[in-house]
Amino acid sequence: GAWKLAPVAGALGVGEALGNYNWWTSSEADVTTRACLFDDEYVFNADGSFNNVQGSETWLEPWQGVDPEACGAPIAPHDGSNPATWLVDEAAGTITISGLGAYLGLAKVHNSGEDGTPVDNTITYSYSLSVDGNSMDVTISGFNAGVPGATWIFKFVKVAPVIAVAGAWKLAPVAGALGVGEALGNYNWWT
């Protein structure tokens, strides 16, 4: 399915340890300022393929040659144009994204740095899925050799599928397609 960053304060954060995002945390204002990031989709397809869907703009930073950081056209290879895959290890609680330029959260963050160039074009994240399966916290460590426990967090929400009710509809040509009764689910008067 498709996921987006949760449109809330704290959807992105980084700090010296898991659970301690004291270096920087996104604010409520960032949801608007970085709207081009919060509308990006991270799509896990049933066939194991993965897509970064950014549309015409995403959030760009100085490491990509954009200073000050701002919304702009996605820059290759972090533009969703390359094939990528995903793999979940439920026992380990990890998601591995493989493919040139593929990522979750921010393109710069990977297991050995913050420069957008992961080893073997592969990034492994830890994840925690909510009970209802509609939200997911993703964390990653190892990017800061000076502070080995340093961790980024990305909070995601599942994108609800669009259900189209527009257009022409007709009753199914089966017995019981139309009925009436004294209560919902009880069509005892006529079917």
Residue ranges of each PLM-predicted region?
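Short, exposed beta-strand-loop hairpins at the edges of beta-sheets
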Residues: 137-149
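Contiguous, well-ordered beta-strand patches that form the walls/edges
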Residues: 10-14, 30-134, 174-191
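Short, hydrophobic/aromatic-rich segments at coil-to-beta transitions
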Residues: 1-2, 92-96, 132-139, 167-168
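Function-determining sites in protein domains
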Residues: 1, 7-8, 13-14, 18
